[in-house]
Amino acid sequence: MNSKILTGVLFAGARGFGASQAAPDPGDGSIKNFSFGPAAITVPVGTTVNWHNNDGEPHTVVSADGLFRSAALDTGETFSFKFTKAGTFKYVCTIHPRMVASVTVK
């Protein structure tokens, strides 16, 4: 009987250990398959948004209003920008202009 209790305790502990992953940071964006993901990000004022190029091609992250502008990001590179005021900021990849998305800061 004691071995059944011990087995149950060990199984319950193993199920909870390492089973969950942290949720993605709401300020993280991905560049993959010639698109920004997610296409719309909403963050609070003061958030730094990080765009990670997970694509096999270089891309840029350039705001329509000129607020931020990355250099060409090669595969594996990241661009970060801290949003200090509220608003909706549209951005584009200037190399592939069909790639568009936005950040809404509240």
Please describe what each predicted stretch is.
Residues 2-106:
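Extracytoplasmic copper-binding redox domains, predominantly the cupredoxin/blue-copper superfamily
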